[in-house]
Amino acid sequence: MKVIRVVSIGVYLDDEKEGILLPKRYVPEGTDIGDELNVFIYHDSESRVIATTQQPAGTVGDIVMLPVVSVTPQGAFMDWGLQKDIFVPKSKQRLGMHVGEKYLVKIYLDEQTERVAATEKFDAFLSNEILTVGEMEQVSLVVYRRTDIGYFVIINNKHTGVLHYSDVFTELEPGDTLKGFIKKITEDNKIDVMPGKPGYERVTDEGEKILSLLAENSGY
């Protein structure tokens, strides 16, 4: 966003209205009017729309693993990388949350409060009915849970699939993220995924790694 005004408490960024404040503690040294800054917009503890150069663990629509830092009768607060913790309403928790524990949650925009919040109950947001991915396509994966045959994973925060134990050579835990690709889609839209890159890209990457190792070891 473009800087439109410099004041003693920070700078104002252009939102085509009155401007959004970026507090002084987040303003990069030497920032001036006309500069473009990469920021995240959210409501602070006083319900003001505010900007920050801090980057959260996720944005609206993302499914991420976050730690609980405090619990109240109304819900729990989780650390997501910003000064203001993200709130998980009691009604959006599965079995309750505990300080110090980590939980897999989906970040969403609460339509009533217009604030960013998080929920453990995100299964309804995941569907394979209409797929937005195809075979051999590169995707982002989040490990959801273990099954008898492999890891049940979330694909691009939208779909679900299975990463078979035989296709992965390291131990994974719920919340782990990795890049992969669509190995197979069945007629009923069940998806198998593989870690890494597909086909030629995978071979090229492995070849480059081997050449790099040979170079480091003088060809041996």
What are these regions (language model features)?
Residues M1-Y220:
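Single-stranded RNA-binding regions, centering on S1/OB-family and related RNA-binding modules
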